[in-house]
Regions:
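Active-site neighborhoods of enzymes that stabilize oxyanions during catalysis
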Residues: 210-219
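Positively charged, proline/Ser/Thr-rich regional signature most characteristic
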Residues: 74-166, 217
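Solvent-exposed loop/turn segments at secondary-structure junctions
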Residues: 112-116, 131-134, 174-178, 203-207
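Flexible, polar/low-complexity N-terminal or interdomain linker segments that lie immediately upstream
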Residues: 23-118
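Catalytic cysteine-centered active loop of the rhodanese-like fold, especially the PTP/DSP P-loop
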Residues: 145-204
Length: 219
């Protein structure tokens, strides 16, 4: 009798899980106030949201914990003085602003094309780290074209003027990847203002681990 009474009390107060809940009952938002965000990718509207399957797991491409270091060494939180490090909510905010027509922002996937073929963050454009690295064959003319045509810098009597240059939000594979850090460090060498460079340190590793939408080249 006492056991029956105790069970009744626990059930009525919600202290026993009855097992009736399903994954469909538990939506997965980006934040408490944001379920999804719509951005432009390849001229099309793409909805960024998290995988709604509560049983989803990490994809194999980012399941490794121990890539050899070097070269895959853990990157610091502060990459360089003046460079702001972003999380997921912040990069989504930049993506939304860019998609709404703010052309002062450019979100850059710094990875080589073979990585990008596997998927990227919707709204990002690919400018591989090798394209800005003289040590990897990038010549002054091609670097200059990127500065002028993609980043909005201007050349004045042989010197770069970054007054109207875009705010660049850069990422690569994650906290163990050196591709976006390489891009950022080269830009700083070229005189690009640190306050106009943002870094999403978590990159594709964190993005995919959180089940956020990934854009494939065909999408």
């Amino acid at each position: 009798m006492k056991l029956k009474l105790l069970t009744t009390i626990l059930l009525t107060t919600g202290l026993i899980w009855t097992g009736t809940g399903t994954a469909a009952d538990k939506p997965v938002g980006i934040s408490a106030s944001m379920m999804d965000a719509t951005v432009k990718h390849g001229g099309k509207s793409v909805k960024i949201m998290r995988d709604q399957n509560n049983k989803a797991v990490v994809i194999p491409a980012f399941a490794k914990t121990s890539r050899p270091c070097p070269p895959f060494c853990i990157q610091p939180i502060v990459l360089a003085p003046g460079i702001e490090t972003l999380g997921e909510n912040e990069i989504i905010d930049y993506l939304v602003k860019m998609s709404k027509g703010d052309d002062s922002i450019l979100v850059v996937d710094s990875r080589t094309p073979d990585w990008v073929q596997k998927g990227t963050i919707p709204g990002a454009v690919n400018i591989p780290w090798t394209a800005l690295n003289p040590a990897k064959g990038a010549d002054p003319i091609s670097i200059g074209e990127i500065m002028l045509d993609r980043f909005g810098a201007t050349s004045l009597e042989g010197l770069w003027d970054y007054s109207n240059a875009k705010t660049l939000v850069m990422f690569c594979n994650g906290m163990w990847c050196g591709q976006s850090p390489n891009n950022i460090k080269n830009l700083l060498k070229f005189g690009y203002p640190a306050h106009k460079i943002k870094w999403y340190r978590g990159g594709m590793q964190n993005w995919s681990n959180l089940g956020l939408t990934i854009a494939k080249p065909s999408s």
